[in-house]
Amino acid sequence: MELNVTTLEGKAAGSVNLSDTIFGLEPRTDIIQRVVNWQLAKRQAGTHKTKGRAEIARTGKKMYKQKGTGGARHGSARVPQFRGGGRAFGPVVRSHAYDLPKKVRALGLRHALSAKAKDGSLVVLDNAELKDAKTKALIGHFSGLGLTSALIVDGAEVNNGFAQAARNIPHIDVLPIQGINVYDILRRQKLVLTKAAVDALEARFK
């Protein structure tokens, strides 16, 4: 598929041929969902914790004698049925991460890219470079391009001035090509790739 290339100023800068094996797939939401769930599970803190009966600071002595009271039989006061007792099967500190095959992760990325291309939400920039790190100037460029919510992906190195200028703009994310991922692609309305990013993606999935 062929897509027009624009500059930051909104001027035409030729066109680029995009590989159908990366940008022309019929998006499969089930694969995309698997990758997003994997990403979110991996970044979950997992610091939740409640005390079990073994961790409660309370005596382990038998509460009262076994027989002759007319009451139910009880041993420890740390058990869950008593006020102040430990939680039964409570959450513990753990990692929520799980494995997802590399091929599924790669396929999920290609389907996310194809989904943006199919929706008309893919923009290709000639380059993402700013001489002066001025947020006001960059906001003007973005409004001219109609970008209010976008993920901008550059080549192996992001231009320092561009990254600094974009840092304070809400709903705008800037990543190098190594950081491109399914979740960040989907959470913004537009996906903006530089020509360097397109070349890197095509080399990666060759």
Swiss-Prot record:
One of its GO terms (cellular component) is ribonucleoprotein complex. GO terms for biological process: translation. Gene3D superfamilies: 3.40.1370.10. The keyword Translocase does not apply. InterPro entries: Ribosomal_uL4, Ribosomal_uL4-like, Ribosomal_uL4_dom_sf. Keywords: Ribonucleoprotein, Ribosomal protein, RNA-binding, rRNA-binding. GO terms for molecular function: rRNA binding; structural constituent of ribosome. Signal peptide: none annotated. The keyword RNA-binding applies. One of the primary rRNA binding proteins, this protein initially binds near the 5'-end of the 23S rRNA. It is important during the early stages of 50S assembly. It makes multiple contacts with different domains of the 23S rRNA in the assembled 50S subunit and ribosome. Forms part of the polypeptide exit tunnel. Belongs to the universal ribosomal protein uL4 family. Part of the 50S ribosomal subunit. This is Large ribosomal subunit protein uL4.
